[in-house]
From Swiss-Prot:
Carbamoyl phosphate binds at residues 54-55, 104, 132, 135, 257-258. Catalyzes the condensation of carbamoyl phosphate and aspartate to form carbamoyl aspartate and inorganic phosphate, the committed step in the de novo pyrimidine nucleotide biosynthesis pathway. This is Aspartate carbamoyltransferase catalytic subunit. The gene is pyrB. Its EC number is 2.1.3.2. InterPro entries: Asp/Orn_carbamoyltranf_P-bd (IPR006132), Asp/Orn_carbamoylTrfase (IPR006130), Asp/Orn_carbamoylTrfase_sf (IPR036901), Asp_carbamoyltransf (IPR002082), Asp_carbamoyltransf_Asp/Orn-bd (IPR006131). Pathway: Pyrimidine metabolism; UMP biosynthesis via de novo pathway; (S)-dihydroorotate from bicarbonate: step 2/3. The keyword Transferase applies. GO terms for biological process: 'de novo' pyrimidine nucleobase biosynthetic process; 'de novo' UMP biosynthetic process; amino acid metabolic process. Keywords: Pyrimidine biosynthesis, Transferase. It catalyses: carbamoyl phosphate + L-aspartate = N-carbamoyl-L-aspartate + phosphate + H(+). It is an enzyme of class 2 (transferase). It comes from Thermus thermophilus (strain ATCC 27634 / DSM 579 / HB8).
Amino acid sequence: MRHLLDFQGWSRTEVESLLDTARVMREVLERPIKKVPALQGFTVATVFFEPSTRTRISFELAARRMSADVVSFAAQTSSLQKGESYKDTLLTLEAMGVDAYVIRADSAGVPHQATRWVKGAVINGGDGRRAHPTQALLDAYTLLEALGTLEGKKVAIVGDILHSRVARSGAELLSLLGAQVFCAGPPSLLPQSLPGAHLTPRLEEALEEADAVMVLRLQKERMEAGLVHLEDYVARYQVTEKRLALAKPQAPLLHPGPMNRDVELEGTLADSARSLVNRQVQNGVAVRMAVLYHLLVGREKA
């Protein structure tokens, strides 16, 4: 693969190969010395036109664990504030010898455009509400650890589905790996359609006999219309101990973060043994190591 923008055109075999590499990288991270020279001599730029904590730090750590040089770009302190375009920003980084670009933007399509501007590998770190492929990969990896397989498993995704790039990429990838994906939320926060998923305004339908549950926050920063009343949302859609009892016993809980405790998820559940939130973060580094390795070393071998 030359870039990672979304999962259009991906085969199940390609995804499984990438996740196999992530398992190797997970073993590296469990060593006393958590570093290998696999990307020595390469330069990775994290280009975030939108704020991020987990994705940016995770990618930077992943690159450093493989001995790559890392350039961290922050829009707030860049020449974007002086009117420079995304294109000219990326061309400047290319002139400095960057090999891979992890790009996040609040507008959909920016990573796709970047592939026409620069020669290096482009990784979508999240673009608007469209896609977040590495989050989907780390979620799939975490679920495979917990469940053994996704074939025939029911995965419930609950929350603000309409504005969620995590839901879009997650439904696409999990269904590709054989899961049955049910997305539940208020009618005003459900899209008209979502490839790979069954949409329902009934939380109980999504949770019933679910093998795993992923909870999403309300993305108020993306809401132009359809803003729900917080108290009403909590009353009808918060994942609580009582509601989670509809799922299979010990069904794991996931959350991509950032989490609003006691809004989308009951606080006690966030800290329970069923919560895999911290495991998701740990696995995110390994998965992103695998992505960088496939893109950079794979290119060199091609």
